[in-house]
């Protein structure tokens, strides 16, 4: 049974979050949680939270055994960017893009 968890509008760029997502794709959830715990990236904490939510969803909604679960799919899509302005010299301004992303984790017991 496939179970999904999402974190939409996560305040990290999709490019940075994909580096972390690639580490755990296809792994058993216990190994994936271990990897994320010791990965020194901001995105690792965000992905770990989504993975824990997917595990809880599988256990509560589908009655799945945690020991059999694997991360079958994990993908990170770009969310909307917040546009901000940074003042510069001589009355100019630069535009800053505060990027967001949508993190999706799918766990399955098959």
UniProtKB/Swiss-Prot annotation:
Q: Does the keyword Chaperone apply?
A: no
InterPro entries tied to this protein: Ribosomal_uL22, Ribosomal_uL22_bac/chlpt-type, Ribosomal_uL22_bac/org-type, Ribosomal_uL22_CS, Ribosomal_uL22_sf
Q: Which UniProt keywords apply?
A: Ribonucleoprotein, Ribosomal protein, RNA-binding, rRNA-binding
- Keyword Metal-binding, does the record have it? no
- Tell me a GO cellular component: cytosolic large ribosomal subunit
Enumerate the Gene Ontology biological process terms.
translation
For this protein, the record's SUPFAM superfamilies field holds:
Ribosomal protein L22
Biological role stated in the UniProt entry: This protein binds specifically to 23S rRNA; its binding is stimulated by other ribosomal proteins, e.g. L4, L17, and L20. It is important during the early stages of 50S assembly. It makes multiple contacts with different domains of the 23S rRNA in the assembled 50S subunit and ribosome. The globular domain of the protein is located near the polypeptide exit tunnel on the outside of the subunit, while an extended beta-hairpin is found that lines the wall of the exit tunnel in the center of the 70S ribosome.
Q: How does it assemble?
A: Part of the 50S ribosomal subunit.
- What family is it from? Belongs to the universal ribosomal protein uL22 family.
Please state what the protein is called: Large ribosomal subunit protein uL22
State which gene encodes it: rplV
């Amino acid at each position: 049974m496939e179970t999904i968890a999402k974190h939409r509008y996560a305040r990290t760029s999709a490019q940075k979050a994909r580096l972390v997502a690639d580490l755990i794709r296809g792994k058993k959830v216990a190994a994936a949680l271990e990897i994320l715990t010791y990965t020194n990236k901001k995105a690792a904490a965000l992905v770990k939270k989504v993975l824990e939510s997917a595990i809880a969803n599988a256990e509560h909604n589908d009655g799945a055994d945690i020991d059999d679960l694997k991360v079958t799919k994990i993908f990170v899509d770009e969310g909307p960017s917040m546009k901000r302005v940074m003042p510069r010299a001589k009355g100019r301004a630069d535009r800053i893009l505060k990027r967001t992303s949508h993190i999706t984790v799918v766990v399955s017991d098959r």
